[in-house]
Design a protein with these regions (language model features):
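Single-pass transmembrane signal-anchor helices and their membrane-water interface zones
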Residues: 1-24
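Short coil turns that delineate tetratricopeptide repeat
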Residues: 42, 76, 110-112, 146
Length: 160
């Protein structure tokens, strides 16, 4: 009987931690919506980007990531495409690839997508049970401001 109670207690303890992360994801996660103004399809790269966006918008994230990757071969510094590739990989639960993309956007330091990259990177860390790394990024978001500041502050309070 004691062993059974210990087992049940252990399961509750470990699943409780995971459930907290799941609650956070359920409450605060929304897939990134790219700006509605799309590039004109004048070149092959823009046609690939437009098709990748179509896959992304229809939630075919695997095909979207492949095409975003193709776009990045000829335009590696396009941070919007890097972010979209990251979110596509995030949706496919390919967290190492997603983390790499979000880190690249953040490290670039000169683009309009840093807020989103920080947010999704922190969520990646939650999904891979790297709670301390997630907290660090949520703290940065909470202090620096930006579009996710309020959500980050609420999550920090919930993680303590």
């Amino acid at each position: 009987v004691f062993a059974g109670l210990v087992l049940i207690g252990s399961i509750a303890l470990f699943s409780g931690k995971k459930l907290d992360n799941e609650k956070i994801m359920k409450r605060y996660y929304k897939v990134y919506e790219p700006p509605t103004s799309q590039r004109s399809a004048q070149s092959g790269m823009d046609a690939d980007f437009t098709l990748a966006l179509e896959f992304y918008n229809t939630r075919d994230y695997e095909k979207a990531a492949i095409l975003f990757n193709k776009v990045l071969e000829s335009k590696p510094n396009d941070m919007q495409t890097v972010l979209l590739k990251g979110v596509s990989n995030f949706e496919e639960k390919k967290y190492p690839e997603a983390k790499q993309s979000f880190g690249e956007v953040i490290d670039d330091k000169d683009n309009l997508y840093i807020d989103q990259a920080q947010w999704y990177l922190a969520l990646c860390y939650l999904n891979t049970n790297e709670k301390e790394k997630a907290k660090q990024i949520f703290n940065v978001i909470g202090k620096e401001g930006g579009i996710y500041q309020n959500e980050a502050k609420k999550i920090i309070r919930g993680l303590k």
